[in-house]
Amino acid sequence: MSLNQFHLSSDQADAYDTAAQLLKSAGVDLDNDLLVPPKDSKKSVMALVGKAGSGKTLLLAKLYEALSQAGVDIILGDYEGKRRRDKRSLAILAPTNKAASVLRMRGVPATTIHRILYTPVYDPEYEKIAEWLAGSSDKPTVEGLTEEALRRAYDFFQAYKSMAGALAAAGLRGSDFITGWKRREEPLDIAFLDEASMLDDRQFEDLQQIFSTLILFGDPAQLAPVNQSGAMVFDGIK
């Protein structure tokens, strides 16, 4: 995959290559769009740091585009269908919804850490819509929803990759289609975490338990969380 189309600076291109090398060692070859099934035993963490304006968010967005093009499944915080264990997957995270919204405005389907640690339980009737939007089933017929409502849901999901937003566009409330939340038990594959300067040790440990490959994007000039004694979680990562 050529970097020329990305319009990255030399520093960004170096960081891209570093991340691509880590991903290749984890079985995701971005140069050749080749994917190897994940290995449960292999764990890796990387930190890509730079001050505000250095282009971390653009770099994250381009890495997301490359993984998506290679065929990696994208994990959405507001819906997760059945996954094959041999499929590679990526979750893009931020500590707060505000930070996740910045990425979503760039077309990057980001979610919050909380939405990954806890997964929603869908009402079976409305889960049919989610499965259809996610591409795993045919278009359903749902009592009380018109074809126009389903079209709005489809258009919204294609534009923003938000399942909750798509169902809201169809005229549903969260309390209609989400019946509860449960703590995640099964592991995930790859994660990109933006605004890693806001991450505390407990969140970092939780994410390392869930993900086999974790890439942090952070600003060393920001203030650390109040319970971190001035230290960033990525300070000790090489």
Model-based region annotation:
Residues M1-K238:
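Conserved ATP-binding/catalytic motifs of P-loop helicase motor domains
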